């Protein structure tokens, strides 16, 4: 549109000379041709503009004024006036044409400038439009690529959804078929479950009878366990009493050791003094002491022979005796070093009494273990050796026949432990069987409940459900009772009895081991004592014997309460 406008403006209609003549001719001013031409000049598209029209109007006005002025001045005289007028008219036309040309040139320059400016603006706008067109084309291509990718993705999604739709339709068809088949199977299972309910009621009755029998068995076992607990308490009391005795003996032995140490210190001091006195008085009293020393040597030889016989007798006696004192070898060694042989004999008698008491206690423990084992095995008749209580008060010769055989107490303890473990395993197995039966019945009941939820329940099914709920409640009660029974059985503290018996067995073994140690200590003490007597000089026997006799006498007097404790026990 702008180009067409510029073409029209750049090519304005320019009147030729004829038109200009007709327009500037005053004679033809009022003619219709001139008027049409003037109108064409005024109405022509893209004409001279408002300035040109104003100039034309001014020129025409000036011409009319001159004609009006020249008319009265010069008379009209034929052809001269016409020529003059024509001449003047032509001059005026030339002036007018020059002015019009000048105006047209100026107008043309303005129009060219406007045209150049407009063409420049047009070119700039065309470049911007081309750039925008290129950008829009690039965006269009990118959008077309995006839309093509999106369309491809949507097509793949549509295909995928179509596949899923077909698969879901197939699954729905399969589900419908399975539903119809399950309905038929459930109807058949309903009939079977009704039959199983009747069988479950019979099984429940059998379980109730078994529970009653188990309850009776548990009552019997609880009674026997109470008896075992009382026996355990008695054994624990005996163990506590023995531990107290042991502590008292240890305290007394410590006191005896201290006294023995003090006596040994005094003996050493006396030895040092006697040696000094012997050195000072050796030369002075040598003649007086010789006959006395000979007599003392003879007496010592006789005493030595007697003591040798007594020591041999004591060695044989100690090898036969079974002393079970719980003391360290060092304590006995220190005591035996300062005590006399008579005191040793008295002590052996006390030890024999204590040994007999320990044997009796071990025998009672062995009898109790055997009786418990027989009760656990279900034997109401005990052994003849266990039922005879009169044999406990017989002499030491009959008691020695009743010594517990080696390993029998340990074997009986192992048997007792095995029987208790079997009892617990049996109870656990019964509980496991009952729990399995209860779980199976519970699964059947859950299956029945699911069936009743699927199908419309009738009166028979509702009554069966009520019976099932009652059976579940009863089974839960039975499970609770069985759990309580299991807890009570496990709470029987059989380990305490076994530990007490094992402790007594260990004590007896320690006493037997101590017996051998005591034999060796006594032999060593006697041998050392005799060797010292033979090694000492002859003149020191009398005073040393007198000095040693006094401490031993004091020690024997102080140790009387210690061994009276064994007699009381």
From Swiss-Prot:
A GO molecular-function annotation: dynactin binding
GO cellular component: centrosome; cytoplasm
Predominant cellular place of this UniProt entry's protein: cytoplasm
Known function: Acts as an adapter protein linking the dynein motor complex to various cargos and converts dynein from a non-processive to a highly processive motor in the presence of dynactin. Facilitates the interaction between dynein and dynactin and activates dynein processivity (the ability to move along a microtubule for a long distance without falling off the track). Predominantly recruits 2 dyneins, which increases both the force and speed of the microtubule motor. Component of secretory vesicle machinery in developing neurons that acts as a regulator of neurite outgrowth.
Family to which the UniProt record says this protein belongs: Belongs to the BICDR family.
Subunit structure: Part of a tripartite complex with dynein and dynactin, acts an adapter linking the dynein motor complex and dynactin.
Name of this chain's protein: BICD family-like cargo adapter 1
Species this chain originates from: Danio rerio (Zebrafish)
Gene: bicdl1
């Amino acid at each position: 549109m702008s180009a067409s406008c510029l073409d029209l403006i750049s090519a304005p209609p320019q009147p030729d000379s004829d038109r200009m003549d007709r327009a500037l001719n005053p004679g033809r001013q009022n003619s219709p041709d001139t008027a049409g031409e003037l109108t064409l000049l005024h109405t022509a598209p893209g004409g001279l503009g408002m300035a040109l029209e104003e100039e034309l109007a001014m020129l025409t006005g000036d011409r009319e004024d001159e004609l009006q002025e020249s008319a009265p001045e010069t008379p009209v005289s034929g052809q001269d006036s016409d020529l003059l007028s024509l001449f003047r008219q032509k001059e005026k036309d030339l002036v007018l044409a020059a002015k019009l040309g000048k105006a047209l040139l100026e107008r043309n320059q303005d129009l060219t400038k406007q045209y150049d400016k407009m063409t420049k603006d047009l070119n700039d706008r065309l470049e911007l439009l081309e750039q925008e067109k290129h950008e829009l084309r690039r965006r269009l291509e990118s959008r077309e690529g995006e839309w093509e990718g999106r369309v491809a993705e949507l097509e793949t999604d549509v295909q995928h959804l179509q596949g899923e739709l077909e698969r879901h339709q197939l699954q729905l068809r399969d589900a419908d078929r399975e539903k119809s088949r399950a309905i038929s199977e459930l109807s058949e299972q309903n009939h079977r479950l009704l039959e199983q309910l009747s069988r479950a009621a019979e099984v429940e009755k059998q379980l109730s009878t078994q529970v009653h029998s188990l309850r009776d068995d548990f009552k019997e076992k609880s009674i026997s366990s109470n008896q075992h607990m009382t026996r355990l308490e008695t054994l624990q009391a005996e163990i506590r009493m023995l531990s107290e005795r042991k502590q008292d003996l240890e305290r007394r032995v410590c006191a005896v050791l201290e006294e023995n140490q003090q006596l040994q210190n005094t003996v050493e001091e006396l030895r040092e003094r006697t040696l000094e006195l012997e050195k000072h008085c050796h030369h002075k009293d040598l003649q007086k002491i010789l006959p006395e020393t000979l007599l003392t040597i003879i007496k010592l030889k006789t005493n030595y022979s007697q003591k040798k016989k007594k020591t041999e007798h004591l060695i044989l006696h100690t090898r036969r005796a079974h002393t079970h004192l719980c003391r360290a070898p060092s304590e006995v060694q220190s005591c035996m070093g300062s005590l006399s042989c008579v005191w040793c004999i008295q002590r052996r008698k006390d030890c024999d009494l204590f040994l007999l008491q320990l044997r009796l206690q071990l025998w009672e423990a062995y009898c109790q273990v055997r009786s418990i084992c027989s009760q656990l095995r279900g034997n109401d008749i005990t052994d003849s050796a266990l039922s005879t209580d009169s044999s406990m008060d017989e002499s030491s010769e009959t008691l020695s026949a009743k010594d517990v055989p080696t390993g029998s107490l340990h074997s009986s303890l192992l048997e007792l432990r095995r029987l208790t473990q079997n009892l617990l395993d049996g109870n656990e197995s019964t509980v496991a069987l009952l729990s399995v039966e209860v779980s199976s019945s519970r699964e059947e009941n859950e299956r029945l409940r699911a069936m009743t939820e699927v199908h419309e329940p009738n009166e028979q099914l509702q009554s069966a459900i009520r019976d099932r709920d009652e059976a579940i409640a009863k089974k839960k009660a039975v499970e609770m009772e069985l759990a309580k029974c299991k807890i009570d059985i496990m709470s029987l503290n059989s380990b305490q009895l076994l530990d007490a018996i094992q402790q007594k067995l260990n004590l007896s073994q320690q006493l037997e081991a101590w017996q051998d140690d005591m034999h060796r200590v006594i032999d060593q003490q006697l041998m050392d004592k005799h060797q010292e007597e033979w090694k000492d000089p002859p003149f020191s026997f009398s005073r040393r014997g007198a000095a040693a006799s006094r401490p031993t006498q004091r020690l024997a007097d102080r140790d009387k309460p210690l061994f009276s404790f064994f007699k009381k026990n």
